[in-house]
Structures are given as C-alpha cells and as structure tokens.
Amino acid sequence: MNLKLLFVISNDEKTLNRLINKFTLPFNTLMHGDGTASQGILDFLGLHKTKKNILMSIISSYDEDGIEKFIREESKIPEIGKGVAFTTPLSSSPKYIEEAYKERVGDNMKNKSPYHLIITIVKEGNAEKVMNTAKKNGANGGTLLKGRGIGGKNSFKFFNMTVEPEKDVILIVCKDNDKNKIMKAILDKNGANTDSQGICFSLPIDMTIGIDE
C-alpha cells in the first residue's frame, strides 16, 4: 500500500482547509506552531514572530501530483518565506487507513527530492538551542510544535510516540548531505545526556514546495 505523510506549514489556514476539502483527506491533523527565524531577521523585514499552521495528513500517491499542483497554483507557499510543503513515505499504516485508500493507490514509489525531515524532541524551552546548533551546521530554519493534552491527558502523540507537555518538537527540513552533520551536532549539544534531554530522528522526503525554489 503506497501511502505518504503530507506536511504543509503555512500561516494560511483557509487554504489548508480548502486543500482538505478538495481532496477529501480523511486522516489529517491541523496544529499551530512557531517559525524559528531569528528576531533580527524578522525586525529587518518588519514582521512579528511567525505563527504557523501545520497540517499533517495521510495521502495516497494517487493524489500526490494533484495536491502538489493545488499548492503551487492556489496558495502562496511557493513564494519565498510563505511556508513549505513536503511528503514522506509511510513504511506501515493501520489496516483501516489502507482500506480507505485501497482503490485509489498507485503502485510505484517516487523519490523526487534530495531532502530529509529531522524531528527533534527536547525539554520545553530548549528549542532555540537546537535551532542555533542546527543553523551552525547547515540548516536554514525550522518549525516549533507545542503539544497539549487531549481528553484530559497531559501528553500527546507524535509519530506514535508519547510526548509530554513540557517538551518541544522541532521540525527541520535539510539537504541530504547536511543531515548527518546536523543530527550529530544536535545530539552532541542537546542529546539525552545534556540538560535538553533531546532525541532526534529523520525521515526521507519526496515532494517539496517552498524549499530552495
């Protein structure tokens, strides 16, 4: 079953909702996060601290080209600094999700982009340290996610991992040849044996929009 995880990071929530409705995406999560551009850059551009909407949705490869076309033609994401969008392959998924897409899924996987998504989870308040380390080793920026409990619980699920509310989740898209250097630096400076108590892992990315365009 050829399913992928779509990430769209943008401050345009209306366009994200249009995307969900147009392609009838049944399995999606819309969250809020903060961009990590430095305050000096934001001041120079006359901008306030960047607030972002993060859409995560499971899609089939059958829909990927249409979704990419929609984002490129009907959103501002391709414009510099307006957001990013990318997909990453899913190695496994629940049977009910596979059944929902069964009749629409293509057979061939495509890997069109030499990028990776680095996901870092650290104690709350340490995200800036992670981004400073990452930028010194080739990263251009990232997105900070703030989790909150659902249904009375004080933790939330991210990639099937339980993340406590006092944790920050940082998403960084980087070039393949920078991935190992960035991850090693993050783990050295902000890993499990440091005050940040961090972990990080990476996922390959397929389609990308808003990255080096």
Language-model features: locations:
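Positively charged, small/polar-rich N-terminal and surface patches that mediate targeting and assembly
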Residues: M1-E213
